[in-house]
Amino acid sequence: IIKVRKQTPQMNTQTPEQQYQELYQKLYILCEEQGWGDPFSYARSREIHMAGILGHKINDDYSGADAFDSEGGCEYKSTIAKSINATYNGISVQDTWEDQERYLIEDKIGKYRNHYYARYEGAEVAEIWKLIAPNVLDIVLPKVKKQYPKKRSGNAKDPRIGVTVSRKEIYQMG
């Protein structure tokens, strides 16, 4: 008779967030070694990764806030560029400049107090910066205002507004 010793399952002492951090890095390395490219071309995986690093709760809905910090909903932006920057793309054009400004302040950028910008090097976060909405609006509103007339007139190939927050602006305001 062969006695089989029943193994007790090991307790996993890692939180789901810690497990995600570990698996995220392993998946990236595997894809890199196989020449498969960046497995996270859509920003959602980076949002989940950033939330784990920052101790935030990821939003389970794909619309609205990316995550929630101690002050409420927050916005995440990430880049793999050599210099940190953030882009706000696909901003809907409103009927008047007053409506456009109100939309940005109340419904889009100003809706979330904290905006977090991360720069990735491979699977690692090289830097994360936090800007508050009033500072982001100080940067973004003049850029939107400059694009607004052409976008509003319908003479642009892409009718939506897109603006970039530069490295210099992030460093100055963050």
Can you name each region flagged by the protein language model?
Residues I1-G174:
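Nucleic-acid endonuclease domains
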